[in-house]
A protein has these predicted regions:
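Phosphodiester-processing cores and adjacent nucleic acid-binding clamps
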Residues: 1-175
Length: 175
C-alpha cells in the first residue's frame, strides 16, 4: 500500500523481454505488476537517451500501454546536473570514478568488456520542456510523471551526505 512502481529502464524486466523480442512475455509481466501494485500505481517507464535499444523499445512500450491501459511515465536517468556536465564527463578527472561506480552498481569489473558505460551524453537532469519535446508523441507520459511526483511526499536536506547504515557481522577482511 502506498507504493508506486515503474517498469524500469532497459535493465527492467519488461524492457528486457522487449529487447529479447518477447512482446507477449513483456505484456504478461506488465499485467502481473499492474495486478500486484494496482492500476493506479503501476506505470510503463519510457526513456529516450538516444540508445538503440531504448529507441527500438519505445514504440513497443507505447503499444503495450494502449493495449493494456497501463499508463506511461517519461523518465530520464540523471547522472549529471547539466547537459554541459554530461558532455564533459568523458574529459573530466572524475570520469574514471563514475565508471568505477557504475561497475560497482552493476557488479562488473572494469576489465569486463560488457561493463556498463554511458553511450550518449543524455544522462543529465532534463527540464520539463526538454522532456516534453522528447516525448511529443505521448504527452500524457510527461503529465503522468508530474502526477507521480505530486503524489510523493519527500523532503531532502541538501548539503548533507546520506550514507546507509549497515553492519558487517562476521566479516574481518573486506577484500
Amino acid at each position: 500500500e502506498g507504493l508506486i512502481c515503474l517498469s524500469g529502464c532497459l535493465a527492467g524486466e519488461v524492457a528486457q523481454k522487449l529487447t529479447g523480442d518477447d512482446y507477449a512475455g513483456a505484456k504478461e509481466t506488465a499485467l502481473r505488476y499492474r495486478t500486484l501494485f494496482g492500476a493506479e500505481n503501476y506505470f510503463l517507464e519510457i526513456q529516450n537517451h538516444q540508445i538503440r535499444d531504448e529507441l527500438r523499445n519505445l514504440p513497443q512500450l507505447i503499444r503495450l500501454s494502449r493495449e493494456t491501459g497501463i499508463p506511461l511515465a517519461a523518465t530520464n536517468d540523471a547522472h549529471y546536473i547539466t547537459k554541459e556536465d554530461a558532455k564533459m564527463q568523458s574529459r573530466r578527472e572524475d570520469a574514471a570514478m563514475q565508471e568505477v561506480l557504475l561497475c560497482i552498481q552493476t557488479g562488473k569489473s572494469l576489465d569486463d568488456p560488457e561493463h556498463m558505460h554511458f553511450e550518449t551524453n543524455e544522462f543529465y537532469l532534463k527540464s520539463t520542456a526538454e522532456m516534453a519535446a522528447l516525448f511529443a508523441d505521448v504527452p500524457e507520459a510527461v503529465t503522468n510523471t508530474a502526477k507521480i511526483a505530486e503524489r510523493c511526499h519527500v523532503e531532502f536536506q541538501t548539503g548533507k551526505i546520506w550514507l546507509p547504515k549497515f553492519t558487517m557481522d562476521g566479516v574481518s577482511d573486506c577484500r
